[in-house]
């Protein structure tokens, strides 16, 4: 019997080598650091506190490898991403702009795809969950009826190629359909009234494009059948996700997650001319997290706050208090949070920083610890 079992094992090993089981993804499996939950809510929550590699692979204005440093960030290294893990983060979101690196038939340049894969590998090798998206490609998936078929064609082309490249990467790699799809360069880019016809049309188009994304990935091979997939509403806002016009895509694997961006409350977190103090009286302004729980989490859909943060207004103690309250409520509602980081440390709008990438240190350690404490 032992000889028979040995023969079977040897035969299985030989067959495995012939079928490509020694892939990059298989080398990553079984490292014992990252569990894969079997439902959307638990998986989304297992991402805990994550970090965005901001202003890097999503940079625009130049092509191919020069793009990575075009917005002032250093070239991403393995040591840098290892430090993200060391600092206590559980996941990394890698924003990527694809439309600057393809030809007219949407074929992505091989050199660009290789570099993106290299950075994804840094994250997985470090023991992090990785979110990969389509970032500053909003013109391609402009959410109107007039552009809907073009948007669906673009998403199908891009995610077919990405899915094929990463088909052997397990579920620790998450795909996110679009970044903040919206009516760019219009008066309704970031906000519209609840019943605005253009706004509602845009949400309906995004629902359809999210479905195209899910169908495209699921038509791929191997782990694409079971990979967790993130989808947003208009501008990835909580308000638009809560709209009756928005619904989650159908998915035979039942593994879709809502993606929300919430620099909230806006007047504290993002408006340079807003208020600077954070007190207990402000806590109700985070009630949108409860609303998201009611519509999505209670109905089996995980929620990831894919971008959040508060700009520096020379109010560090208040930002620590905000960070504690924000992540405490998010965690209580079984949502993970990914801190936006564009390495901007100056006082003023759009400056978000936590990790000094060049020197591998934390700019605001007390603020980070306040957030990590809610995901222990």
Tell where the protein language model's regions lie, with residue ranges.
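Positively charged n-region of N-terminal signal peptides that target proteins for export
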Residues: 1-9
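C-terminal motif of bacterial Sec signal peptides marking the signal peptidase cleavage site
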Residues: 17-20
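N-terminal carbohydrate-binding accessory modules
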Residues: 24-91, 295, 370
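Acidic/histidine-rich helix-loop elements
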Residues: 53-76, 104-108, 147, 267-285
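An active-site-proximal structural segment forming one wall of the substrate-binding cleft
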Residues: 71-92, 102, 106-136, 140-177, ...
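Active-site region of glycoside hydrolase catalytic domains
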Residues: 153-274, 288-311, 332-333
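Aromatic-rich peripheral "rim/lid" segments of glycoside hydrolase catalytic domains that contact
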Residues: 315-376
